[in-house]
């Protein structure tokens, strides 16, 4: 039955309703322990108020725990440890889980994340303070009981040594449990502090980057200025670009001055013909079965053009948008050809 309670209390809850029930139960048990502590403190105060008694009587009554029997103290020790295990350890697990969830969430601003981490750190500090009160009470009880000899048997879900038959092993397990619990609280607090410092550094870097980008690309801050001064001095980059632009303009101007003017002449109507190679066949005189050997000799282009005029007019191909300028002889020659063609057709 006890183990089932441990398993239920120490299982990480997933819904908010379950979390509220567990937290309410833990708070109830913690309040019960606080009432025990208050009653013990009152008895201790009444015992320490007696200062006029002898030193021996004062030493016997300096701790109110001596007024209880060992069986009662063992019972209260068990109860205190159960509260320590259920309230402190399970609550610590919830705080650790909440810290992991905060790291994985996205926030609208650094300020929002910082506020949540600060709130979590306050909860950790308060929970650790309550845990220390429980631990101090247990230490006082065990000091009065007599140490390991009267260490109660505790069915712990987290440390099996607390249920060991050997009382010395039970005391070792209890001290290990307390040391581990304190270390986990301190480690979680250190993690939160480290995250807060990291967020502060990231926010500072982001602010510096925004300021640098405003200096490089944005306009100057004129919130406090009445007039905008547009005559800002050129930067080094602007000076380099201006120098390059002047050099290019000077080079283009020098190039235009050196080049001669371009003269455009109208194209001729008759395209020059390409000379064809002359075929010369060489035949042997003695042998009748022979294969002709063709000797190709290119003729002179000028001689080929002087042999005879062309008997037809090719359609001119113009390489410009200007219309051709025909001479009078060309027009007369073209008219004669049209007459001959019409006569031939008739």
UniProtKB/Swiss-Prot annotation:
The protein, known as: Uncharacterized protein MG218.1
